[in-house]
């Protein structure tokens, strides 16, 4: 009886794992799903997407960014990004507000507004 109970418990656990892995992600949002970015979402998205894009090379080399090591620098950069958002987030004649606030844009579309600095 102990062996059959153990086998039943293992089969039930495996079934639960398969069901959770196949149906568990059904309602999660794709990371590149278009979304509206207005107000403080714009500089926050800038920090998340553009700053990460610039520091990926250092992470690939195994070097941690010095800004992540110092907590105060990140808040300073967020404040700077908010002040300079018009400078950093322009593309041709259309701005990021027109493109991503008035209509939804994906992460890839938003990253086109990242400055080269």
Curated annotation (Swiss-Prot):
Keywords: Amidation, Carbohydrate metabolism, Cleavage on pair of basic residues, Disulfide bond, Gamma-carboxyglutamic acid, Glucose metabolism, Hormone, Hydroxylation, Secreted, Signal, Toxin. Belongs to the insulin family. The modification 4-carboxyglutamate is found at residues 98, 109. Heterodimer of A and B chains; disulfide-linked. GO terms for biological process: glucose metabolic process. GO terms for cellular component: extracellular region. It comes from the Eukaryota. It is found in: Secreted. Disulfide bonds join 38-101, 50-114, 100-105. The modification Cysteine amide is found at residue 114. Residues 25-29, 53-94, 116-117 form a propeptide. Residues 1-24 form the signal peptide. This is Con-Ins T3. The modification 4-hydroxyproline is found at residue 34. GO terms for molecular function: hormone activity; toxin activity. Expressed by the venom gland.
């Amino acid at each position: 009886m102990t062996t059959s109970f153990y086998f039943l418990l293992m089969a039930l656990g495996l079934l639960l794992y398969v069901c959770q892995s196949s149906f568990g992600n059904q309602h999660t949002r794709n990371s590149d799903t278009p979304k509206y970015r207005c107000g403080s979402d714009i500089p926050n998205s800038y920090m998340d997407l553009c700053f990460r894009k610039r520091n990926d090379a250092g992470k690939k080399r195994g070097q941690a960014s010095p800004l992540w090591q110092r907590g105060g620098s990140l808040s300073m950069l967020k404040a700077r990004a908010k002040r300079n958002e018009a400078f950093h987030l322009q593309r041709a004649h259309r701005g990021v507000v027109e493109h991503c606030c008035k209509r939804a844009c994906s992460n890839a579309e938003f990253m086109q507004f990242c400055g080269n600095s």
